[in-house]
Amino acid sequence: MQTLSSAPDPAVSVAVTILAVLLALTGFGLWTAFGPKAAKLTDPWDDHDD
């Protein structure tokens, strides 16, 4: 039985790290897409002349 003072399993640490990175990237993407600076973003399809 593990207690709170014992070291966690390395697989759990890796999984938590990967989850944290994915959540950070998702948050950054949402902030970029819908945050205050989103009004300055342009759509390349609209800028392209046919």
Swiss-Prot record:
GO cellular component: plasma membrane-derived thylakoid membrane
InterPro entries found in the cross-reference section: PSII_PsbN (IPR003398)
Presence of keyword Phosphoprotein: no
Transmembrane regions listed in the UniProt entry: 14-34
Record's keyword terms, sorted: Membrane, Thylakoid, Transmembrane, Transmembrane helix
GO biological process: photosynthesis
Record Pfam families: PsbN (PF02468)
Domain of life: Bacteria
Cell compartments where the protein resides: Cellular thylakoid membrane
Topology class, membrane: Single-pass membrane protein
Family the entry assigns: Belongs to the PsbN family.
Role this protein plays: May play a role in photosystem I and II biogenesis.
Annotated NCBIfam families: PRK13183.1
Protein's UniProt name: Protein PsbN
Source organism of this protein record: Prochlorococcus marinus subsp. pastoris (strain CCMP1986 / NIES-2087 / MED4)
